[in-house]
């Protein structure tokens, strides 16, 4: 039977998975989809719009974060933190600044995790980076999130080594509805959200509009944020088969960053919220890490849903620009941040006096230090066309193509001379408003095509597919107009999976049992930043593809009110290449170092389980035990960027070293309770009243500090500093009540780090691989927030 797209609108305003209690991150194999048909929607139906895979039948390891769970965590300062509590996922703030966050899955960093928005890749093609601060509006605009660990469900995401995260934004509901909410933290960080859905309009139109405004400070010193976020979703239904979906999302923002790691001694002296990135300039707080950015993002999707043939076509464009304050020092000068007063903050008065005192023959002040605005931006555009044809009742053929265009630019502009008349930088004078250093960018053309077959019966779900990738990369000098030659590469991936239902749930039997396995191989193209790493127009020597091999197997069981999944995985990462500039100056040849031959092996076991203890109480638990280690001693080469001549060669000793930046042991649990109560405000309006509570516990252990492989040039170099394990407890309470006909009120309060644990969140290894030389960021102390929502139907 053909689906009407307005059913999708209804689905997108209904919980994905609900089995009592507050919203959950359901473990794979949950049977709760069949528990309450009137309040659920299958993931298969949602995937019509955004490639959500069905937890019930897929041979992949999936976790879906539902709208209820997102509502509980909307006060989190960083979007990725809503993904905590999933085994193998380490999602935290990077430095404590609002919006600055990092995501690791199964030991792989952000550039090896695919991020998709409504089924469309949104990462940069230069390095695979994902700057979450550019997407601050996502926390309010998101309807649901699916985390696909391992190779992922998408055939077009070639960077999914650790996994894939697919984010679904809100669309119009079936009927007119609105929401107003406001929340604030103990530091005064306040967010206001307005959301309105038109419901189904005449002639097949529907729209949803959301606006949010966030301002205030976090627990870190001088961490102001000011951002206005928006989402607009418009759909048009053409009959029962065709639908157009337009989405616009953006978040112009300004926020102060803490981007200088701290030592243990500094944290003990000044506290974990200490930042040495600011001081008083002309009597006002001045941050040297202020960031400003705006990336408006637009998509247009065409959906055809037929009995035998269905397709999804998308076009998208993003035009990003912004910048961030940074420091610059003359050749003989020390750094700005080294000028500290008695409180540990930047002494701008001393810096200005030093700048003014240094005179040339004409009496002009020659600055030793200055502030610049590091400006950057890009144009990102692309198109995806995919379709599937049902050959028989059991066999389906899928195929598609994708094109991505990514063009970047960057330049540095003199922002503040700090009392001087000009800055003498490598022999050239620079005055206020001048551009300093190189101005360049990279252009990327990335294409891919895939074909996949699926075989589905009552017992079996099999799929196998292959994808071919092509990348073309060129660098351009925006000062001279010169361009480099094109660097070209090809890649290919093959992946498949199988799931077998040993026991299927029936109307008379709730129990279900299945086993699954998946595997894949990816000859992966390096990012453009590897091919074009230098500040000149040279192409990096001897670039070769990475070779990634992944495999996983597991078992799922489900019963009335509960479920469990256990899986084991292995990921072999071969021929990882790192290319980094040693110098980036406009007037001299840069040197680069390239490290090749790095191998690593990631393996682990994961468990998730949940159980409804009563009608009002639900518990879930998870655990992960992993081993991620290097398996090779790579080769480092330093060479001249222009001539390509080798300057020196050296060995890089990473064999048997633990991978850093994420815990290799995780475990935790969560209790969720919902208590129906009588109406407290008005008689006859309390039928939907309830009080809910959620308490979570997350433990992280066996975590090593991050480190650069280039620092391991001695065979005696050992593991990075092992961070202390830590336990975090969070709690949320809330009250839902009907305050008037069609008006629901929700009052909530959240406390994170309930017992005020003192812990290290992330950091960089030091020379001695110990706490004394370690530099990093300590996690936030106990923090609370309160809020109020009004929903109108």
Task: Give the predicted meaning of each segment.
Residues 6, 249-251, 499, 513, ...:
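Conserved C-terminal beta-signal and adjacent last beta-strands/turns
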Residues 27-30, 40-74, 102:
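N-terminal periplasmic "start-of-domain" segments of outer-membrane beta-barrel proteins
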Residues 80-121, 143:
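Extracytoplasmic beta-strand/coil segments of soluble accessory domains associated
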Residues 121-149, 168, 266-268, 273:
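Short acidic/polar hinge/loop motifs at secondary-structure boundaries
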Residues 136-181:
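A beta-strand signature from Gram-negative outer-membrane beta-barrel systems
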Residues 177, 184-215, 220-258, 293, ...:
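Transmembrane beta-barrel wall of Gram-negative outer-membrane proteins
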Residues 260-265, 470-475, 486, 500-552, ...:
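Surface-exposed extracellular loop regions of Gram-negative outer-membrane beta-barrel proteins
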Residues 393, 456-461, 471, 568-572, ...:
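Gram-negative outer-membrane beta-barrel transporters
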């Amino acid at each position: 039977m053909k689906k009407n797209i307005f059913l999708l609108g209804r689905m997108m305003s209904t919980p994905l998975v609900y089995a009592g209690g507050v919203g959950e991150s359901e473990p794979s194999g949950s049977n709760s989809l069949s528990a309450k048909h009137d309040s659920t929607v299958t993931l298969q139906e949602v995937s019509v719009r955004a490639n959500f895979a069905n937890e019930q039948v897929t041979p992949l390891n999936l976790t879906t974060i539902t709208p209820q769970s997102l509502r509980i965590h909307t006060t989190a300062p960083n979007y990725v933190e809503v993904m905590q509590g999933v085994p193998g996922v380490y999602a935290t703030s990077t430095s404590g600044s609002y919006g600055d966050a990092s995501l690791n899955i199964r030991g792989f960093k952000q550039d090896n995790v695919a991020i998709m928005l409504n089924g469309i890749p949104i990462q940069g093609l230069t390095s695979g980076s994902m700057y979450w601060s550019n997407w601050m509006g996502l926390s309010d605009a998101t309807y649901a999130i699916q985390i696909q660990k391992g190779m992922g469900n998408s055939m077009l995401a070639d960077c999914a080594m650790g996994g894939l995260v697919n984010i679904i934004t809100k669309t119009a509901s079936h009927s007119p509805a609105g929401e107003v909410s406001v929340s604030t933290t103990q530091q005064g960080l306040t967010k206001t959200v307005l959301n309105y859905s038109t419901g189904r309009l005449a002639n097949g139109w529907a729209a949803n509009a959301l606006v949010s405004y966030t301002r205030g400070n976090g627990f870190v010193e001088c961490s102001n944020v000011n951002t206005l976020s928006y989402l607009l979703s418009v759909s048009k239904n053409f009959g029962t088969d065709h639908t157009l979906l337009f989405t616009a999302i953006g978040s112009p923002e300004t926020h102060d960053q803490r981007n200088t790691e701290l030592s243990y001694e500094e944290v003990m002296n000044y506290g974990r919220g200490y930042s040495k990135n600011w001081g008083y300039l002309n009597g006002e707080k001045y941050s040297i890490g202020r960031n400003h950015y705006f990336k408006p993002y637009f998509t247009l999707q065409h959906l055809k849903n037929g009995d035998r043939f269905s397709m999804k076509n998308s076009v998208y464009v993003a035009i990003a620009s912004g910048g961030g304050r940074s420091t610059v020092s003359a050749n003989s000068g020390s750094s700005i941040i080294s000028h500290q007063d008695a409180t540990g903050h930047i002494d701008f008065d001393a810096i200005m006096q030093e700048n003014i005192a240094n005179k040339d023959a004409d009496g002009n002040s020659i600055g030793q230090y200055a502030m610049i605005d590091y400006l950057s931006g890009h144009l990102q555009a692309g198109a995806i066309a995919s379709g599937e044809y049902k050959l028989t009742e059991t066999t389906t053929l899928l195929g598609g193509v994708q094109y991505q265009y990514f063009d970047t630019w960057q330049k540095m502009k003199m922002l503040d001379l700090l009392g001087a008349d000009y800055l003498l930088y490598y022999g050239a004078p620079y005055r206020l408003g001048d551009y300093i250093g190189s101005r360049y960018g990279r252009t990327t053309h990335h294409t891919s095509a895939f074909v996949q077959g699926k075989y589905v019966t009552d017992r079996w779900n099999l799929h196998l597919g292959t994808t071919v990738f092509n990348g073309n990369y060129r660098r351009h000098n925006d000062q001279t107009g010169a361009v480099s030659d094109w660097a070209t590469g090809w890649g290919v991936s093959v992946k498949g999976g199988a799931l077998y239902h040993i026991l299927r749930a029936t109307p008379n039997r709730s129990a279900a049992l299945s086993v699954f396995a998946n595997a894949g191989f990816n000859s992966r193209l390096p990012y453009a930043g590897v091919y074009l790493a230098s500040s000149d127009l040279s192409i990096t020597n001897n670039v070769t593809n990475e070779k990634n091999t992944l495999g996983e197997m597991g078992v799922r069981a489900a019963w009335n009110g509960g479920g469990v999944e256990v899986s084991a995985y292995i990921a072999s990462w071969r021929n990882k290449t790192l290319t980094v500039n040693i110098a980036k100056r406009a007037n001299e040849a840069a040197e680069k170092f390239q490290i090749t031959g790095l191998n690593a092996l990631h393996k682990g076991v994961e468990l998730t389980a949940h159980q409804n203890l009563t009608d009002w109480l639900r518990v879930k638990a998870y655990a992960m035990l992993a081993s991620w280690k290097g398996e090779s001693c790579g080769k480092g080469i330093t060479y001249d960027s222009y001539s390509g001549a080798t300057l020196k060669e050296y060995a890089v000793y990473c064999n048997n070293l633990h991978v850093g930046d994420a815990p290799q042991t995780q475990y935790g649990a969560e209790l969720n309770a919902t208590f129906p109560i009588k109406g407290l405000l008005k008689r006859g309006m309390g039928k939907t009243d309830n009080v809910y509570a959620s308490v979570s516990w997350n433990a992280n252990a066996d975590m090593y500090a991050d480190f650069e492989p280039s620092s391991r040039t001695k065979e005696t170099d050992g593991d990075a500093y092992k961070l202390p394990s830590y336990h975090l407890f969070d709690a949320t309470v809330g009250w839902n009540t009907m305050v008037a006909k069609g008006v629901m009120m929700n009052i909530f309060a959240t406390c994170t780090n309930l017992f005020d644990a003192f812990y290290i969140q992330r950091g960089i290894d030091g020379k001695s691989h110990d706490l004394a030389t370690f530099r990093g960021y300590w996690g936030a102390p106990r923090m609370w927030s309160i809020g109020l929502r009004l929903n109108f139907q």
